[in-house]
Amino acid sequence: MKLYASGEDYLETILILHREMGMVRSVDVSRHMAVSKPSVCHAVAVLQEGGFLAMDGDHFLHLTERGRIIAEKIYERHRFFTDHLIEAGVDPKTAEADAYRIEHVISDETFHRLKEKYQSESENKGL
């Protein structure tokens, strides 16, 4: 099953909310993403069908191993681009919005090369 940017956003949001709150329900996702509850219900159903997400008997959402790996990958990219754009002087709100777009379109190879370059430069500055 192909996972689109919106699905990745839902997984990332569930990861973030789980870290902040411990337990996550659809209503929490709806509030955090400012989307309707029916939109969340549809996304949850699609993500469950794809094996990215599970819901327990109390309607709490849980990332599967597959979903967690994708969510962490997207979240890492998001933090990386947000932090570096802010460091470059971009307004934090703009940096956040741009990071959300960049995180979905950049290839794994390009992201890893950028990350290596920034880590290398950061280590060299410390010398």
Where are these regions (language model features)?
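N-terminal helix-turn-helix DNA-binding core of bacterial DNA-binding proteins
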Residues: 2-35
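N-terminal positioning helix adjacent to the helix-turn-helix/winged-helix DNA-binding module
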Residues: 6-9, 25, 66, 77, ...
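Canonical helix-turn-helix DNA-binding module
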Residues: 26-57
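Basic, amphipathic "hinge/linker" alpha-helix immediately C-terminal to the N-terminal HTH DNA-binding motif
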Residues: 59-77
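Arg/Lys-rich, alpha-helical DNA-contact motif
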Residues: 75-109
